[in-house]
Amino acid sequence: MSRIIPLITLILLALAGTVTANEREDDVAAEAAAADSDDAPEQDEASSSEAEEEDGADTVKPLELLGKTVQPGTFETLHWAPDQSFRSIATPVPVLVAHGNEPGPRLCLTAAVHGDELNGIEMVRRLMYELEPTELAGTVVGVPIVNLDGFRNGSRYLSDRRDLNRYFPGHEKGSAASRLAFSLFNNIVRQCDYLVDLHTGSQKRINQPQLRADLDKSEVVAFAKHFGGMTVLHSPPGDGMLRAAAVEEGIVAVTMEAGGPNRLEDEAVDYGVQALETLLENLDMRKASRFWGAPQPVFFESEWIRAGQGGILLSEVELNDQVRKGEILGTVTDPISNTGSAIIAPYDGRVLGMAVNQVVHAGFAAYRIGEEKSAEEVEAKAELSDQTLEDNGFKPEEPAAPKEEEEASDAPREEDPAPPADDTE
C-alpha cells in the first residue's frame, strides 16, 4: 500500500505538468492572435490610405479665384473689380469660368485689352458658352472685356489716352493703366498655365486671322502648333505687352489677331473660335468634335509696305492673297492733281494685314507682307535658339519690379505711348 501512494502521486504530478504546458501553449497562441489582430487594423488603414491617395490623384479640387470658389464640373460668372476711381460706384468686369470635372491645364482667354476690338469679345462668348464643364479636363477662364473703360467709349485706349497693352505686368502704385494691368495680371493671368490674348487690327487696318508668337522659344512653337490651320507670324512681344509679361512669368502665351476694330466680323470670329476649339482638343481638355487638318502657314519674316505719297489709297489685293515680287498691291492718288503712285510688293509673300481704303499720308503703313517658312525650319530655329542660350550659361532672371517712385510719378513711359504704325497688337 505504501508503494501505491507514491505511484499515484507521481501520476498526478505528471498530469498537472501536462495541463500547465497546454495552458502555456494556449496563452502563447492567444497572445499571437491578439498581436495579429492589432496589426490588422494598421494594415487595413495603410491599404485604405494608399487607395485614397490613388483616388485623390485624379480628384479635381475646387478652384479659388477672385475670392470665390468654383466647384468642379460647374460654370460660374465671377467679377473682377479693378476700378480705382470711385469704389462706391465701381463697375466689376465679368469673368467667365468653366471648371472641369477632370484634371488638366488652366487656359486664360483675354479680349478687348483695346476697347474698340470687338471680335475677340464674341469669340470668348461663343467658346465659353458652348463648353460643358462636366466633360472638360482642366479650366478655361475667359475675360471678354478687359478694358471696360475703352469699350464703353468705343476707344482703343483708356480714358486717360493710355494704351493698356504697354503697361504689363503693371504696378500696384503706378498710374491708372499700370494699376489695372497689375490687377489683371496678378489676380487672373498668373493663376493660369496658358494665355491667348485676342486682338484685331488698329487705326483703320485689318488683319488676316493669325497668331503672333515668339518662335525663338520652343515651348511657344509647340503651343502655336495646337491651333489647327491658323497662320502663325513670328513676332517677339514688345515691352509692356500682356504676352511679354506672361512669358516672363513662365506662362506660355500667344496673341491671336483677327479682323479690324469697331466692327463684328462673323467670318473672322468663326475662324478664331475654330482655332480655339482645336486648341482645347489638342491640349486634351475636351474630346475632339472635329479635326482641323489644314496645313499651318508659318511666317518668320514680315514687313509693312508703305505709301510713297499722300492721297487716296485704293487696294488691288485682299487679305490672305499670295503676291509676287513686283506685283501692284494698291495705288495712292492725289485727289486734286490726279497724280498717283503704285505700292509694289518687294518680294513673294502673303498679305497678312492691310489698311482699308482711305486717305493716307506719305509713309503710311499700308500692307503687311509675310514671307513663309516651313514648320521644320521654325522648329530647328527655336531649338537652336534654346541650345545657344544653354551653351552660354543663360538663366532667365526674375523680372525686376518697377521702381515705386517711377511708377507713381509722371515718368515718360507713363505718358500715352503712340503705337507704332507697323504694330497693331
Label every PLM stretch briefly.
Residues 1-23:
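Sec-dependent N-terminal signal peptides
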Residues 22-425:
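Structured catalytic-domain cores with a bias toward divalent-metal coordination
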